[in-house]
């Protein structure tokens, strides 16, 4: 997978070598959303191939929900072009809605309908066959989210997590090719989250493309095949978790080295090596930042051993994705290190 | 309901007749939720009890106390039952439509409907017929009583069919009003309240203007058709008094320029046009949630159509005198007093026509004028697409030109109305001033442009304050001042003249020189009118200049100090829009 990012233009593309010729499942060009003087989404371009589980990450106010609402045809942007599965969502909104499954943040349900009635409303809207066919499909979707036994109860009696699962079932009803899930796991218990992860992986394996946002970033990292970080309306980086970490300039990790003797000499030697910064010495423990590759890390340790230092421990500590995001949110939104990418 | 292997899920989803007859998912959704047996039975029983009471009480009274013949006694409950039907459909139905759609918006589930691939029209029809489904069933429960009364009361179909056709078309119109109120108003309680207020205004208060020359408005209600057929519904034994009979029988058909149409036909036609406008509003909102309620061209067309309807209904009644309140009063009381139309009432009617036109103009300005945010978005989009300006009919474009066009049309309509009245045989000694047309246009243009510029430049809140302090306060204060003494009439007239509300009446009084009125009327009002209109016109010009400066400044702030469009047009530096960028303005 290759990632490209132009800091000024906020253009990102996630390219999977396996499907180079496929029409992108999600294609966004120069998308901008304004709320008065506030720019919620700032000239964002994005391309996601079919079959990806694509995570959109960012702090509150980053522009995730606005992007999702535009993708879901619920909001008109200031300008921009969006194609889902090759369909221009502004030119053919009704057609686009046939391929979209959208699950909003804190997904609501109507208080006056039973679970199966709620699902049947949308099954019928999407033209999912005759009554028995629709009922069969509703049963399948409820089974998929483990809510079959609740099909006859009123939606208002469901718990928060059950409501989320019900709305997920509604989103899956018409077998959408593009799933847009805004915080789908909020309110779910660990078991339901695992079911959600499995369900999304199965859907992606069947060819659906999923774009998902979550505040539980570690979970998103586990779930997604690629990620994208957004802040203040701009896209910052995209790729796998490690690639994003690297793109954000947070590839360095903290290494702690336990040296039996001559710790000060070891510190001096480390100070002369590449990729090493911020060395501190506490007794026999040397703590420093290292930004090189794992091969370079191995070479560093080998060099120390060859110099006769007695190393008894090596601990590696990566900054968590949450920490990176907090830093990104607090520090601004530019990524200086990546080369510019020409727009298609 | 049969059960499948899945607990709680039926094998098929068509358990009832209503579910099956119209495959609209939104309609079926409300058939399910609003016709649950427990609640439905209670409401139907309640309706049955009330309808039974309203049927048997007057019938029994007529039969045993009034000693009426059986056929006459059977007719007695008809109006009582019709009243109940009107309450069920007009009040309960409309309230539930408004509250129901707002409840969905409130819960957030309305977004799901926006996401469904149904066309906007199917969604509108689903809500329109689905939300008040329980009220329609309650109405159906009362129908056997009506049927019995009509059958045993020997009332022919040509009498009751037009009335019930208009009752049903009125109900649909009112429900559409509720749907629009519910779609526009965000708060559930407010939606219910607003819909009821709008209905009372539109279909009860405003139709009173029909008594003062604006005949069209009565066709928004059931009354014209009911009036036309009242006599045939009444028991024959109580049609006694001759003047009552003449009052009820001597009804003109609906007149529209040279056409004579049955009241029912014209009422249904008038209501259909308004219903179509409401459907257009809803269609636009379903298509795009942020859209204005009406597009600029549609608003202009609606305004022109309203002028045509107002004139078309009123002008044919001038010759016979049926347009004038004095004649109506004389007819109603069978007296000859005040049978001749008076110049005072002519002036009031001309003033009222101007005021109604001004109110309609301002309502449409409120609908089509873009907020500052919309204008900025439109400019950004235009810049991105490399256009010279925002398309003139898009929601984001200024409504200045359309305001002027509507004011011009309104002024023309108003002038025609005044000319036809004053030029009629009833007012031979009077003449309309030669420059009446331009003055009437100026009155509407001044008020319209002031309103539009303030709204477009400063927003609705500022306009509201301006309306209160310049529109309402002077009239109220002048009214109080005028009550103090005769000497205070002159300052009161000056004070009231500040308000645009008084301008149409002052204009009418100025343009039709009259004698026989006191000095306040014949001298002060024309002077005050000329002075305040001068101020209004200067203010309007000044505000338009300011607005244009603001437009320029905004364009520069959005696009930068260099006018890219000018450069683009001259070919020096044409910004190329990215391929595939579309405008949806």
Task: Write out the residue ranges for each language-model feature.
Chain A
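C-terminal coupling/interaction segments
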Residues: 11, 16, 292-344
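Extreme N-terminus of proteins, especially the signal/transit-peptide cleavage junction
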Residues: 16-24
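ABC transporter nucleotide-binding domains
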Residues: 23-26, 33-212, 217-231, 236-237
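ABC transporter nucleotide-binding domain
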Residues: 197-291
């Amino acid at each position: 997978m290759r990632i490209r990012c132009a800091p000024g233009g906020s253009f990102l593309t996630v390219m999977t070598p396996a499907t180079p010729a496929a029409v992108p499942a999600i294609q966004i060009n120069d998308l901008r959303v304004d709320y008065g003087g506030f720019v919620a989404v700032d000239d964002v371009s994005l391309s996601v191939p079919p079959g990806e589980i694509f995570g959109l990450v960012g702090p509150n106010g980053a522009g995730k929900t606005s992007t999702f609402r535009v993708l879901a045809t619920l909001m008109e942007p200031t300008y921009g072009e969006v194609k889902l599965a090759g369909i221009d969502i502004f030119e053919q909104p009704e057609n686009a809605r046939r391929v979209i499954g959208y699950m909003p943040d804190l997904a609501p349900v109507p208080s006056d309908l039973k679970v199966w009635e709620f699902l049947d409303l949308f099954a019928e809207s999407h033209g999912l066959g005759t009554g028995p066919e629709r009922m069969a499909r509703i049963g399948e979707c409820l089974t998929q989210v483990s809510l079959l036994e609740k099909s006859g109860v009123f939606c208002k009696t469901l718990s928060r997590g059950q409501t989320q699962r019900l709305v997920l079932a509604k989103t899956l009803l018409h077998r959408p090719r593009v799933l847009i899930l805004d915080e789908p796991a909020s309110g779910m218990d660990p078991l339901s989250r695992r079911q959600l992860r499995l369900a999304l992986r199965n859907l992606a394996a069947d060819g659906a493309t999923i774009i998902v946002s979550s505040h539980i970033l570690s979970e998103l990292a586990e779930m997604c095949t690629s990620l994208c970080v957004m802040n203040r309306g701009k896209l910052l980086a995209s790729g796998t978790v490690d690639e994003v970490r690297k793109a954000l300039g947070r590839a360095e990790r903290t290494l702690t080295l336990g040296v039996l003797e001559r710790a000060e000499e070891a510190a001096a030697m480390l100070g002369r090596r590449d990729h090493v910064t911020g060395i501190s010495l506490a007794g026999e423990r040397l703590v420093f930042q290292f930004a090189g590759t794992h091969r370079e890390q191995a070479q560093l340790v080998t060099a120390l051993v060859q110099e006769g230092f007695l190393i008894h421990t090596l601990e590696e500590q990566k900054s968590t994705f949450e920490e990176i995001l907090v830093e990104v949110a607090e520090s601004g939104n530019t990524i200086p290190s990546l080369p510019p990418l020409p727009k298609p | 309901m049969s059960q499948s292997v899945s607990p709680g899920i039926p094998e098929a989803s068509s358990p009832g007749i209503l579910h099956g007859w119209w495959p609209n998912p939104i309609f079926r959704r409300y058939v399910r939720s609003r016709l649950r047996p427990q609640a439905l039975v209670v409401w139907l029983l309640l309706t049955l009890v009330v309808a039974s009471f309203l049927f048997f009480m007057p019938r029994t009274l007529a039969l045993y106390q009034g000693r009426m013949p059986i056929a006459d006694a059977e007719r007695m409950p008809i109006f009582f039952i019709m009243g109940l039907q009107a309450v069920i459909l007009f009040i309960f139905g409309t309230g539930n439509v408004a509250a129901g759609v707002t409840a969905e918006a409130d819960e957030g589930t309305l977004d799901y409907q926006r996401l469904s691939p149904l066309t906007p029209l199917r969604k509108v029809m689903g809500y329109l017929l689905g939300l008040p489904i329980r009220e329609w069933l309650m109405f159906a429960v009362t129908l056997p009583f009506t049927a019995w009364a009509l059958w045993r009361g020997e009332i022919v179909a040509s009498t009751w069919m037009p009335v019930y056709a208009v009752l049903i078309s009125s109900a649909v119109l009112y429900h559409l009003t509720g749907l629009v109120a519910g779609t526009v108003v965000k708060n559930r309680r407010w939606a219910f309240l607003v819909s009821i207020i709008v209905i009372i205004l539109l279909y009860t208060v405003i139709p009173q203007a029909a008594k003062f020359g604006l005949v069209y408005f009565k066709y928004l209600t059931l009354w014209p058709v009911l009036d036309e057929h009242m006599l045939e519904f009444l028991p024959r034994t109580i049609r006694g008094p001759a003047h009552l009979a003449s009052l009820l029988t001597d009804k003109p058909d609906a007149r529209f320029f040279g056409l004579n149409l049955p009241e029912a036909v014209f009422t249904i036609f008038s209501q259909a046009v308004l219903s179509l406008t409401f459907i257009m509003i809803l269609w636009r909102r379903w298509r795009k949630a942020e859209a204005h309620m009406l597009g600029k061209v549609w608003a202009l067309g609606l305004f022109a159509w309203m002028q045509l309807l107002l004139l078309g209904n009123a002008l044919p009644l001038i010759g016979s005198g049926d347009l004038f309140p004095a004649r109506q009063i004389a007819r109603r009381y069978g007296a000859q007093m005040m049978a001749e139309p008076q110049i005072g009432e002519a002036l009031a009617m001309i003033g009222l026509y101007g005021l109604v036109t001004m109110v309609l103009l301002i309502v449409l300005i409120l609908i089509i004028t873009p907020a500052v945010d919309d204008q900025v978005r439109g400019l950004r989009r235009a810049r991105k697409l490399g256009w010279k300006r925002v398309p003139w009919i898009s929601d984001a474009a200024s409504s200045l030109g359309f305001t002027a066009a509507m004011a011009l049309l309104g002024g023309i309509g108003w002038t025609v109305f005044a000319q036809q009245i004053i030029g009629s045989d009833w007012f031979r000694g009077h003449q309309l001033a030669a420059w009446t047309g331009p003055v009437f246009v100026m009155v509407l243009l001044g008020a319209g442009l002031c309103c539009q510029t303030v709204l477009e430049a400063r927003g609705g809140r500022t306009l509201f304050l301006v309306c209160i302090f310049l529109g309402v306060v002077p009239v109220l204060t002048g009214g109080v001042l005028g009550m103090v003494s005769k000497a205070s009439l002159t300052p009161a007239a000056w004070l009231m003249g500040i308000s645009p509300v008084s301008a149409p009446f002052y204009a009418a009084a100025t343009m039709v020189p009259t004698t026989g009125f006191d000095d306040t009327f014949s001298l002060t009002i024309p002077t005050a009118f000329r002075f305040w209109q001068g101020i209004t016109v200067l203010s309007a010009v000044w505000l338009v200049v300011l607005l244009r400066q603001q437009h320029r400044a905004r364009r520069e702030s959005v696009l930068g100090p260099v006018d890219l469009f000018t450069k683009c047009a001259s070919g020096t530096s044409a910004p190329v829009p990215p391929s595939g960028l579309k405008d949806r303005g």
